[in-house]
């Protein structure tokens, strides 16, 4: 890494320019801290001796005369994208020329590469006496005149060349002005860029002093500005144009009372004495940094970027295509489904109702409020993807630029390369999916480039990075560290805010930080309130972002946004940790040098402070409790930071109190220890680094290392020192041995231990460790289940795991695994197989409807319970119901629950389980749901359980316990409807099928008899059991028995089951006047259907007739299945809708043809011009841009310049051909030269090849899709397209051609026509998939 100050050997020259006389008056050369003989030789100017010239040549090089001359030299164009770049047409002045000899002054103030142009203004002030507000700075770069701000008029850049001052012929107060600016003053906007650009490679700048204009004309100006109109002409036509640092009030003060400027506007005119003092201190400190930089880099470079000393904890990668890409983010959002993998999406676009934000999320996720509430500047889509519970955020703008960001744990030790690699792997499949959308996403063609493509620029920003200085300081040493930063604060290099924490030094590093978003200051939030009135919140749009120099409110916000990068230095026992927040990779390299030069100075030089090198820490002694705990947490945070994994966990300092925490050593430290001391250590494990660690217990009262089990959320064993040594054969000895061998202590270890050591059963009400048992509460065991078992059998609750990663209430899952005697993962795999079924939606009484398919549900089960990759989020409340159903399906096992409500027990059983319990074949398990967790109930003998964990968990029909459960279920069963099995008792009839709805309830039976068609027999929604009667999840069948057969069965049923008598109350008639059924009496009247008949059955003649406008079956079918044969009415609606939108479809084809014709013509001009240009010659380049301006606008010239500056000549032409320019959108102008009749003929000629003609469109078999594209390139199945051409009736085509010609010739219709390029019928209509939730909000 190179860290040099080029301005020491190639100094900055500042030439003063007088616009009134159009002449250069004086040059200041900033030599900086050069040797005395160099300074002396420079100042001799024309009297230099040969010896002086030799000194200057040795110091500045062979071209020393050029560096110290009046020669105008620009930089190489690096990193100046933010400045207003203006193509300089033939100005008559070469940019690289010798100016007439003028006076030269030499300044000893240093210029540094990290100086912003704001810093340069201050240094010009101390050297020349011209305060910042009077400076108009300009310079040349790549033959381009540039200034340090941007002036926009109605959103377009204004040319700013102060050398044109004398060309303005209108005057106010004796000063030349641009009068057009005043008439459009409300449309002016100034964007200050001084703070967002470094001087870097610029070595010659020019300054026009406002005083050269104002001072001679002060009297005339004072008189003129008394008139408001003349004041506005002068301010907007001159001051705001060239000296925008001045507000109107500040300008007025400058004219009337210039000596008051420093008092009234200290930011515009700072105290010269204070500024000189600060800059000299800054110079001293920065010179010291540069002097030591290479030495420090060489000392630490080997470890600077390694995983051990660097940890990126958050980052954003920006991918910038070299070519412009038009991407329809609204359509990408619509076509991209929300899934458990990518559960959240947000889009911002301009809809028919204005700026609009739409968000959607998968039902297993939450609404992305954090992203939908953001402030957007351009149409943007945000996609959030989860991989192993880590969120990756992809933001794509409509110009093809996209950003990838994520966060990591410091312990993962990601460096820059691994961050880029990780984010690239995340992004690639999403980019492929978007690119496959074709014209729907890319209406002008093209695709998003992958991060690996050559046609892109990649930058890393918004990083949070931790780095480590491998030395440790005492408390006094860390205090000294803080005090030494005060000089940097006085020099303005850093800023210290607020209170400081013990052991942490927090400050903002300001110097050289410039990678901010200049637009963030634009919107000012103004809050006002007062007694007796509500708080008012207003958003003010700044017209001039230099307002931070003359408005205290803006200044406060400016300092908040642009005040520097947050740096935290942590005093640690083992090293010094430095955290840097929201930085770029370039800033990291720069800040690292400053910080490590500072830190290294603590241990080198005459004023070094006492430190202990990390490699010499083998002689650690037991320190104070806080420092000892900190050392443990610093070296192995995964082990000692328990709340990292569980916010409710007890902290280590409570589990192992002072003076019991041990001392930890690394392998490197152990190798340097004396053999005798090495023998005292216990080898264990560093969970953070994944390497061995060694422990000792130096405190004499607690000399023996012990390992605590069951306290860490991940079951890691925690070291802690004890008074006595664990004896062989004891429980503690077994735990220590297991922990030292396996590093964890888990369920099976506890089972093994309990088998050896546990001899008693716990009382009910306590938390039950895994594989321990507790007695049932007496009111259940001794009252409810009285006399159901005999001694020595006992009722008990068995302890099982209650949590897993991502699930806080996993007790039911582990209880089911224990009951079925399965490994938990084996259970999850089996029920996942069962979930992957077409009828997945019935699970959990319809909870399965949350998922788009059984495969998706199965995948989520595996990810959550086997791979443990997903957090359940909203599914967390429903997975238990789904699991209970799946266990019933897989193992024919049903569960009943006793829920402990503060000592009162509630018996809970699902309707399906009741049906099972009341059936002849039954198999149940009993589960207790308590405040401490969910546990299975069992019958066992204590000695038998202690020996081999044997117990009975499942109860069947002959078990006495089942009798109790059955009687309780019968009591709870309040269903007064008949039992399905009773139908079997009606001679000649059997239940052929049970019809089940999507909520897993039985709603009807199909009764078989000796007829061909079944009798449709509805029942109240009821639970059902899986028995020998088939079940059917489809719709009500259309082929059913006649009224005669149906009524015959109902008559027999009423006779046999008088308590359930079916009494018709109304006849059902459809719109065809057919009688199709009847409605029965009662609160829950049921719809009985039979085969349609034209004759009213005699048994129903006296009943009222109820007309079914739509058969409920048709509604169900429309919801669940696409219509195979649309209704005639639907055909008519589709056709009408098609005709209404046919003109929009024709416009899409028209613009697609026009894009190709217009763009290809202009591109050929550019290509020919490109091939004729020698880009190595300035005159040839100037001619290239001059001719280019004849047929493209200024913005396109900027784009072409950028491509040429960032791409080699051979590759540039390919990039130009792919790019989208402004000229691609100026399509209609050439057509306006036609007459109406000529244009109609021309349009016919253009569009006929794109049309598939029809005499008429008789039928449209399906509705139009909301997103449409040109039929020529469509990747969507569009009903308006055939053979890649647009279907149009012949009689409509002629009419549309005339309408299109009239619209083209009407200038008021231009914007309306261009908007059709969106390719959306209704931009607020979105595809709504079953598992998605969409919300829309307008942003004003």
UniProtKB/Swiss-Prot annotation:
Keywords: Transcription, Transcription regulation, Virion. GO terms for cellular component: virion component. It comes from the Viruses. Coiled coil: none annotated. It is found in: Virion. Its main location: virion. The keyword Transcription applies. Putative initation factor. Belongs to the asfivirus G1340L family. This is Early transcription factor large subunit homolog.
């Amino acid at each position: 890494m190179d860290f040099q100050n080029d301005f020491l050997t190639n100094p900055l020259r500042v030439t003063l320019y007088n616009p009134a006389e159009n002449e250069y008056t004086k040059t200041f050369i900033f030599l900086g801290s050069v040797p005395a003989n160099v300074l002396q030789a420079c100042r001799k100017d024309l009297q230099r001796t040969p010896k002086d010239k030799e000194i200057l040549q040795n110091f500045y090089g062979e071209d020393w005369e050029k560096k110290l001359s009046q020669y105008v030299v620009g930089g190489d164009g690096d990193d100046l994208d933010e400045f207003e770049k203006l193509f300089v047409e033939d100005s008559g002045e070469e940019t690289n020329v010798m100016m007439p000899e003028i006076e030269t002054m030499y300044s000893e103030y240093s210029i540094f590469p990290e100086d912003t142009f704001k810093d340069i203004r201050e240094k010009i002030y101390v050297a020349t006496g011209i305060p910042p507000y009077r400076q108009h700075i300009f310079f040349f770069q790549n033959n381009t005149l540039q200034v340090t701000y941007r002036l926009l008029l109605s959103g377009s850049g204004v040319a700013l060349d102060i050398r044109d001052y004398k060309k303005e012929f209108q005057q106010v107060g004796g000063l030349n002005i641009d009068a057009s600016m005043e008439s459009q003053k409300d449309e002016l906007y100034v964007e200050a860029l001084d703070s967002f650009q470094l001087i870097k490679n610029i070595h010659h700048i020019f300054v026009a002093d406002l005083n050269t204009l104002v001072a001679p004309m002060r009297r005339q100006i004072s008189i003129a500005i008394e008139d408001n109109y003349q004041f506005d002409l002068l301010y907007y036509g001159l001051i705001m144009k060239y000296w925008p640092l001045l507000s109107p009030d500040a300008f007025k003060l400058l004219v009337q009372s210039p000596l008051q400027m420093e008092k009234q506007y200290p930011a515009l005119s700072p105290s010269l004495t204070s500024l000189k003092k600060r800059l000299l201190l800054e110079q001293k400190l920065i010179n010291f940094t540069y002097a030591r930089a290479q030495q420090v880099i060489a000392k630490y470079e080997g470890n600077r970027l390694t995983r051990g000393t660097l940890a990126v904890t958050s980052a954003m990668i920006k991918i910038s295509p070299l070519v412009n890409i038009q991407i329809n983010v609204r359509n990408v959002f619509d076509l991209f489904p929300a899934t458990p993998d990518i559960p959240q999406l947000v889009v911002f676009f301009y809809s028919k109702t204005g700026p609009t934000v739409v968000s959607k999320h998968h039902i297993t996720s939450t609404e992305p409020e954090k992203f939908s509430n953001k402030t957007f500047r351009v149409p943007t889509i945000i996609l959030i993807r989860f991989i192993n519970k880590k969120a990756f955020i992809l933001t794509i703008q409509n110009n093809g630029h996209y950003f990838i960001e994520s966060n990591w744990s410091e312990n993962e030790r990601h460096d820059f390369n691994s961050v880029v690699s990780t984010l690239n792997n995340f992004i690639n499949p999403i980019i492929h999916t978007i690119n496959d959308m074709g014209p729907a996403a890319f209406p002008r063609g093209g695709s998003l480039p992958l991060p690996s493509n050559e046609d892109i620029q990649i930058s890393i920003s918004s990083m949070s990075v931790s780095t480590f200085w491998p030395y440790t300081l005492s408390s006094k040493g860390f205090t000294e560290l803080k005090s030494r930063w005060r000089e940097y604060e006085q020099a303005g290099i850093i800023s210290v805010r607020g209170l400081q924490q013990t052991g942490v030094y927090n400050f903002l590093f300001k110097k050289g930080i410039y990678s901010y978003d200049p637009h963030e200051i634009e919107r000012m939030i103004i809050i006002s309130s007062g007694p007796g009135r509500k708080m008012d919140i207003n958003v003010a749009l700044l017209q001039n972002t230099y307002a931070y120099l003359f408005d205290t409110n803006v200044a406060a916000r400016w300092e908040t946004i642009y005040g520097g990068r947050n740096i935290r230095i942590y005093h640690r026992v083992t090293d010094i940790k430095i955290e840097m927040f929201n930085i770029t990779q370039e800033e990291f390299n720069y800040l690292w040098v400053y910080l490590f030069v500072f830190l290294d100075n603590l241990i080198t030089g005459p004023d070094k402070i006492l430190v202990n090198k990390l490699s010499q820490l083998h002689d650690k002694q037991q320190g104070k409790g806080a420092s000892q705990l900190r050392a443990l947490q610093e070296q192995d945070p995964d082990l000692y930071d328990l709340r990292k994994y569980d916010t409710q966990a007890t902290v280590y300092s409570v589990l192992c109190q002072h003076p019991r925490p041990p001392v930890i050593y690394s392998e490197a430290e152990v190798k340097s220890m004396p053999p005798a001391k090495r023998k005292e250590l216990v080898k264990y494990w560093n969970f953070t680094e994944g390497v061995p660690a060694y422990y000792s217990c130096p405190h004499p009262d607690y000399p023996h290392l012990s390992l605590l089990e069951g306290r860490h959320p991940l079951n890691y064993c925690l070291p802690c020192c004890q008074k006595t040594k664990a004896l062989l054969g004891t429980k503690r000895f077994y735990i220590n041995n297991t922990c030292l061998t396996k590093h964890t202590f888990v369920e099976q270890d506890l089972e093994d231990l309990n088998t050896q050591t546990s001899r008693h059963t716990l009382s009910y009400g306590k938390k039950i460790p895994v594989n321990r048992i507790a007695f049932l509460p007496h009111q259940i065991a001794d009252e409810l289940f009285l006399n159901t078992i005999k001694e020595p059998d006992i009722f008990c609750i068995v302890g099982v795991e209650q949590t897993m990663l991502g699930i806080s209430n996993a007790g039911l899952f582990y209880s089911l695994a224990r009951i079925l005697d399965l490994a938990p993962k084996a259970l999850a795999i089996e029920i996942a197989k069962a979930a992957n079924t077409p009828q997945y939606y019935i699970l959990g009484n319809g909870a399965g409807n949350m998922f788009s398919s059984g495969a998706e549900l199965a995948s989520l089960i595996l990810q959550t319970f086997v791979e443990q990759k997903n957090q359940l989020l909203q599914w967390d409340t429903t997975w238990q119901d789904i699991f209970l159903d799946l266990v019933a399906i897989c193992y024919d096992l049903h569960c009943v629950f006793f829920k402990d409500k503060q000592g009162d027990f509630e018996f809970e059983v699902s309707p399906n389980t009741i049906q099972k319990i009341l059936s002849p074949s039954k198999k149940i398990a009993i589960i207790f749901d308590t405040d401490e967790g969910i546990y299975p109930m069992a019958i066992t003998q204590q000695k038998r359980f202690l020996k081999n964990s044997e117990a009975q968990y499942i109860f069947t029909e002959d078990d006495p316990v089942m009798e109790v459960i059955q009687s309780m279920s019968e009591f709870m069963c309040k269903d007064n409807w008949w039992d399905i099995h009773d139908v079997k008792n009606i001679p000649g009839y059997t239940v052929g099928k049970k019809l089940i709805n999507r909520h897993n309830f039985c709603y009807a039976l199909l009764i078989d008899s000796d007829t061909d068609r079944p009798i449709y027999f509805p029942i109240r929604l009821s639970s059902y059991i899986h028995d020998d009667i088939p079940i059917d999840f489809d719709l009500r069948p259309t082929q059913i028995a006649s009224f005669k057969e149906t009524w015959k069965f109902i008559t027999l049923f009423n006779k046999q089951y008088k308590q359930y008598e079916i009494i018709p109350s109304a006849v059902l008639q459809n719109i065809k006047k057919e009688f199709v059924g009847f409605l029965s009496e009662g609160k829950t009247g049921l719809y009985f259907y039979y085969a349609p008949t034209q004759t009213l059955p005699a048994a129903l003649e006296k009943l009222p007739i109820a007309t079914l406008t739509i058969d409920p079956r048709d509604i169900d079918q429309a919801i669940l299945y696409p219509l195979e044969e649309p209704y005639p009415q639907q055909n008519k609606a589709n056709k009408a809708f098609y005709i209404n939108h046919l003109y929009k479809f024709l416009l899409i084809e028209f613009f697609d043809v026009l894009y190709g014709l217009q763009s290809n013509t202009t591109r050929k001009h550019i290509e020919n011009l490109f091939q004729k240009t020698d880009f190595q010659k300035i005159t040839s380049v100037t001619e290239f841009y001059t001719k280019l301006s004849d047929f493209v606008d200024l913005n396109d010239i900027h784009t072409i310049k950028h491509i040429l500056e960032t791409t080699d000549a051979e590759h540039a032409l390919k990039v130009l051909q792919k790019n989208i320019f402004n000229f691609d959108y100026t399509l209609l102008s050439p057509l306006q030269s036609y007459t109406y009749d000529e244009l109609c003929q021309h349009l016919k000629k253009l569009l006929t090849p794109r049309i598939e003609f029809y005499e008429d469109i008789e039928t449209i078999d399906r509705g139009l899709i909301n997103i449409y594209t040109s039929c020529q390139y469509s990747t969507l199945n569009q009903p308006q397209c055939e053979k890649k051409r647009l279907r149009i009736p012949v009689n409509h085509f002629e009419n549309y051609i005339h309408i299109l010609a009239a619209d083209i010739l009407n200038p008021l219709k231009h914007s309306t026509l261009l908007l059709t390029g969106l390719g959306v019928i209704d931009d607020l209509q979105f595809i709504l998939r079953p598992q998605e939730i969409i919300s829309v909000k307008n942003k004003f």
